[in-house]
Amino acid sequence: MCHTSHSSGCPMACPGSPCCVPSTCYPPEGYGTSCCCSAPCVALLCRPLCGVSTCCQPACCVPSPCQVACCVPVSCKPVLCVASFCPTSGCCQPFCPTLVYRPVTWSTPTGC
């Protein structure tokens, strides 16, 4: 079930933090759920969602053991790039696979 309430109403909080609000749960019902932040980026809100969500785009790019820092359901930008760009770039977007979980590959969009 997908909840949009506070952490008490979220089935699975992001590691290291309460469930983000506002929130969206990925993947869809039947595949298990997790929380994905749709607000400005918070580094601790992270789960490997790109493999199952419509698309993920981080609001900011931070060094993290997590594959995604913050996700919002926006247009996917499937540009493959060197993963190490993420911690050093001021503006990154992930490639969003649609079928399976896999590490996020980062890109540096024009203008960043």
Swiss-Prot record:
Give disulfide pairs as residue numbers. none
Q: Which GO terms describe its cellular component?
A: cytosol; intermediate filament
Q: What is the lineage of its organism?
A: Eukaryota, Metazoa, Chordata, Craniata, Vertebrata
User: Function, please?
Assistant: In the hair cortex, hair keratin intermediate filaments are embedded in an interfilamentous matrix, consisting of hair keratin-associated proteins (KRTAP), which are essential for the formation of a rigid and resistant hair shaft through their extensive disulfide bond cross-linking with abundant cysteine residues of hair keratins. The matrix proteins include the high-sulfur and high-glycine-tyrosine keratins.
Output this protein's name: Keratin-associated protein 12-4
Sorted UniProt keywords: Keratin, Repeat
Q: Where are the sequence repeats?
A: 10-14, 20-24, 25-29, 35-39, 41-45, 46-50, 56-60, 61-65, 66-70, 71-75, 76-80, 81-85, 86-90, 91-95, 96-100
**In which tissues is this gene expressed?**
Restricted to a narrow region of the hair fiber cuticle, lying approximately 20 cell layers above the apex of the dermal papilla of the hair root; not detected in any other tissues.
Which region ranges are annotated with the description 15 X 5 AA approximate repeats? 10-100
- At the top level, the lineage of the source is Eukaryota
Q: How does it assemble?
A: Interacts with hair keratins.
